[in-house]
Amino acid sequence: MIIKGRAHKFGDDVDTDAIIPGPYLRTTDPYELASHCMAGIDENFPKKVKEGDVIVAGENFGCGSSREQAVIAIKYCGIKAVIAKSFARIFYRNAINVGLIPIIANTDEIKDGDIVEIDLDKEEIVITNKNKTIKCETPKGLEREILAAGGLVNYLKKRKLIQSKKGVKT
Protein backbone atom coordinates (compact mmCIF):
# COMPACT_ATOMS: atom_id res chain seq x y z
CA MET A 1 0.00 0.00 0.00
CA ILE A 2 1.26 3.46 -0.91
CA ILE A 3 0.16 6.72 0.67
CA LYS A 4 1.03 10.05 -0.93
CA GLY A 5 0.27 13.43 0.57
CA ARG A 6 1.52 16.73 1.87
CA ALA A 7 3.26 16.82 5.25
CA HIS A 8 1.88 18.94 8.08
CA LYS A 9 4.75 19.19 10.58
CA PHE A 10 4.43 19.46 14.34
CA GLY A 11 6.96 19.10 17.15
CA ASP A 12 7.42 16.85 20.16
CA ASP A 13 4.84 15.99 22.81
CA VAL A 14 1.72 16.91 20.84
CA ASP A 15 -0.93 15.92 23.35
CA THR A 16 -4.53 14.89 22.84
CA ASP A 17 -5.73 18.12 24.48
CA ALA A 18 -4.02 20.08 21.68
CA ILE A 19 -5.35 17.71 19.01
CA ILE A 20 -8.97 18.07 20.18
CA PRO A 21 -9.41 20.46 23.13
CA GLY A 22 -11.91 19.57 25.85
CA PRO A 23 -14.68 22.03 24.89
CA TYR A 24 -15.14 20.18 21.57
CA LEU A 25 -15.64 16.76 23.14
CA ARG A 26 -19.38 17.22 23.58
CA THR A 27 -20.12 15.97 20.07
CA THR A 28 -20.01 12.42 18.74
CA ASP A 29 -20.14 13.59 15.11
CA PRO A 30 -16.72 12.72 13.63
CA TYR A 31 -16.89 15.55 11.08
CA GLU A 32 -17.64 18.08 13.81
CA LEU A 33 -14.62 16.76 15.73
CA ALA A 34 -12.56 17.05 12.53
CA SER A 35 -13.51 20.71 12.13
CA HIS A 36 -11.63 21.36 15.42
CA CYS A 37 -8.65 19.08 14.73
CA MET A 38 -5.40 20.51 16.15
CA ALA A 39 -7.33 23.52 17.53
CA GLY A 40 -4.98 23.66 20.50
CA ILE A 41 -2.08 24.41 18.13
CA ASP A 42 -3.54 25.80 14.88
CA GLU A 43 -7.26 26.60 14.63
CA ASN A 44 -6.97 26.80 10.82
CA PHE A 45 -5.46 23.33 10.47
CA PRO A 46 -8.61 21.63 9.06
CA LYS A 47 -8.76 24.22 6.24
CA LYS A 48 -5.16 23.42 5.23
CA VAL A 49 -5.65 19.65 4.94
CA LYS A 50 -6.39 17.89 1.68
CA GLU A 51 -7.68 14.30 1.72
CA GLY A 52 -4.70 11.93 1.98
CA ASP A 53 -2.29 14.35 3.67
CA VAL A 54 -0.13 13.21 6.58
CA ILE A 55 0.85 14.61 9.94
CA VAL A 56 4.57 14.52 10.74
CA ALA A 57 5.76 14.96 14.31
CA GLY A 58 8.59 14.37 16.72
CA GLU A 59 8.63 12.31 19.91
CA ASN A 60 5.65 11.16 21.98
CA PHE A 61 2.83 12.09 19.59
CA GLY A 62 -0.62 11.71 21.15
CA CYS A 63 0.47 11.89 24.78
CA GLY A 64 -1.92 13.04 27.49
CA SER A 65 -5.41 11.72 28.05
CA SER A 66 -6.57 8.57 26.31
CA ARG A 67 -9.35 10.27 24.35
CA GLU A 68 -10.22 8.33 21.22
CA GLN A 69 -11.73 11.54 19.79
CA ALA A 70 -8.21 12.79 19.04
CA VAL A 71 -7.64 9.98 16.55
CA ILE A 72 -11.16 10.36 15.11
CA ALA A 73 -10.63 14.12 14.61
CA ILE A 74 -7.39 13.49 12.72
CA LYS A 75 -8.83 10.72 10.53
CA TYR A 76 -12.03 12.57 9.60
CA CYS A 77 -10.05 15.73 8.88
CA GLY A 78 -8.62 13.84 5.89
CA ILE A 79 -5.27 12.75 7.32
CA LYS A 80 -4.31 9.26 6.13
CA ALA A 81 -1.28 8.62 8.34
CA VAL A 82 0.75 10.08 11.19
CA ILE A 83 4.53 9.78 10.96
CA ALA A 84 6.34 10.37 14.24
CA LYS A 85 9.57 9.47 15.99
CA SER A 86 7.45 7.84 18.70
CA PHE A 87 3.84 7.63 19.86
CA ALA A 88 2.13 7.51 23.20
CA ARG A 89 1.10 3.86 23.50
CA ILE A 90 -2.64 4.46 23.94
CA PHE A 91 -2.72 6.85 20.95
CA TYR A 92 -0.96 4.24 18.79
CA ARG A 93 -3.54 1.57 19.73
CA ASN A 94 -6.44 3.97 19.24
CA ALA A 95 -5.06 4.87 15.80
CA ILE A 96 -5.00 1.21 14.74
CA ASN A 97 -8.50 0.65 16.12
CA VAL A 98 -9.94 3.66 14.27
CA GLY A 99 -8.05 2.97 11.02
CA LEU A 100 -5.50 5.80 11.11
CA ILE A 101 -2.04 4.57 10.10
CA PRO A 102 0.74 5.27 12.65
CA ILE A 103 4.27 5.16 11.22
CA ILE A 104 7.51 5.41 13.20
CA ALA A 105 10.44 7.17 11.52
CA ASN A 106 13.14 9.76 12.03
CA THR A 107 11.20 12.82 10.90
CA ASP A 108 14.03 15.38 11.04
CA GLU A 109 14.38 15.56 7.23
CA ILE A 110 10.66 16.05 6.55
CA LYS A 111 9.59 19.69 6.53
CA ASP A 112 6.15 21.26 6.60
CA GLY A 113 4.71 21.22 3.08
CA ASP A 114 6.96 18.44 1.74
CA ILE A 115 5.26 15.84 -0.42
CA VAL A 116 5.83 12.37 0.98
CA GLU A 117 5.16 8.96 -0.52
CA ILE A 118 4.96 6.16 2.02
CA ASP A 119 5.37 2.55 0.91
CA LEU A 120 4.01 0.49 3.80
CA ASP A 121 5.31 -2.80 2.39
CA LYS A 122 8.87 -1.57 1.71
CA GLU A 123 8.82 0.47 4.92
CA GLU A 124 10.12 3.55 3.12
CA ILE A 125 9.15 7.19 2.99
CA VAL A 126 10.22 9.16 -0.07
CA ILE A 127 10.28 12.93 0.26
CA THR A 128 9.45 13.40 -3.40
CA ASN A 129 10.32 17.09 -3.69
CA LYS A 130 13.81 16.29 -2.26
CA ASN A 131 14.28 12.82 -3.79
CA LYS A 132 15.25 11.60 -0.31
CA THR A 133 14.31 8.18 1.12
CA ILE A 134 13.86 7.44 4.83
CA LYS A 135 13.35 4.01 6.39
CA CYS A 136 10.30 3.64 8.60
CA GLU A 137 8.52 1.14 10.79
CA THR A 138 4.93 0.33 9.83
CA PRO A 139 2.26 -1.77 11.54
CA LYS A 140 2.51 -5.49 10.83
CA GLY A 141 0.50 -8.66 11.34
CA LEU A 142 -2.85 -8.22 13.04
CA GLU A 143 -2.39 -4.44 13.25
CA ARG A 144 -2.02 -4.30 9.45
CA GLU A 145 -5.11 -6.50 9.01
CA ILE A 146 -7.15 -4.19 11.25
CA LEU A 147 -5.95 -1.14 9.30
CA ALA A 148 -6.72 -2.82 5.96
CA ALA A 149 -10.29 -3.39 7.17
CA GLY A 150 -10.61 0.29 8.08
CA GLY A 151 -10.40 -0.20 11.84
CA LEU A 152 -11.27 -2.67 14.56
CA VAL A 153 -15.07 -2.55 14.22
CA ASN A 154 -14.89 -3.23 10.47
CA TYR A 155 -12.34 -5.99 11.07
CA LEU A 156 -14.64 -7.69 13.58
CA LYS A 157 -17.65 -7.33 11.26
CA LYS A 158 -15.72 -8.89 8.36
CA ARG A 159 -14.74 -11.78 10.62
CA LYS A 160 -18.40 -12.06 11.68
CA LEU A 161 -17.42 -11.59 15.30
CA ILE A 162 -19.97 -8.83 15.74
CA GLN A 163 -23.35 -8.53 14.05
CA SER A 164 -24.20 -4.94 14.72
CA LYS A 165 -23.68 -2.14 17.18
CA LYS A 166 -25.71 -4.15 19.70
CA GLY A 167 -23.00 -6.57 20.72
CA VAL A 168 -20.85 -9.59 20.17
CA LYS A 169 -22.13 -12.49 18.10
CA THR A 170 -22.62 -15.63 20.17
From Swiss-Prot:
Biological or metabolic pathway of the protein: Organic acid metabolism; 2-oxosuberate biosynthesis
Keyword Lyase carried by entry: yes
UniProt keyword Lyase present: yes
GO MF entries: aconitate hydratase activity; homoaconitate hydratase activity; maleate hydratase activity; protein homodimerization activity; zinc ion binding
EC number: 4.2.1.114
UniProt pH dependence: Optimum pH is 9. Active from pH 8 to 10.
Site (Critical for substrate specificity): 26
Reaction equation(s) it catalyzes: (2R)-homocitrate = (2R,3S)-homoisocitrate; (2R)-homocitrate = cis-homoaconitate + H2O; (2R,3S)-homoisocitrate = cis-homoaconitate + H2O; cis-(homo)2aconitate + H2O = (2R,3S)-iso(homo)2citrate
Disulfide bonds: none
EC supergroup of this enzyme: lyase
UniProt-listed GO biological process terms: coenzyme B biosynthetic process
Gene Ontology CC: catalytic complex
Record keywords, A-Z: Lyase
Record motif YLRT, residues: 24-27
InterPro entries named among the record's database cross-references: Aconitase/3IPM_dehydase_swvl, AconitaseA/IPMdHydase_ssu_swvl, IPMI_Swivel, LeuD, LeuD_type2/HacB/DmdB
HAMAP family assigned to the protein according to its UniProt record, in alphabetical order: LeuD_type2
NCBIfam families recorded: HacB_Meth, LEUD_arch
Subunit annotation: Heterotetramer of 2 HacA and 2 HacB proteins. Cannot form a complex with LeuC.
Similarity comment: Belongs to the LeuD family. LeuD type 2 subfamily.
Entry function: Component of a hydro-lyase with broad substrate specificity for cis-unsaturated tricarboxylic acids. Catalyzes both the reversible dehydration of (R)-homocitrate ((R)-2-hydroxybutane-1,2,4-tricarboxylate) to produce cis-homoaconitate ((Z)-but-1-ene-1,2,4-tricarboxylate), and its hydration to homoisocitrate ((1R,2S)-1-hydroxybutane-1,2,4-tricarboxylate). Is also able to hydrate the analogous longer chain substrates cis-homo(2)-aconitate, cis-homo(3)-aconitate, and even the non-physiological cis-homo(4)-aconitate with similar efficiency.
Name of this protein: Methanogen homoaconitase small subunit
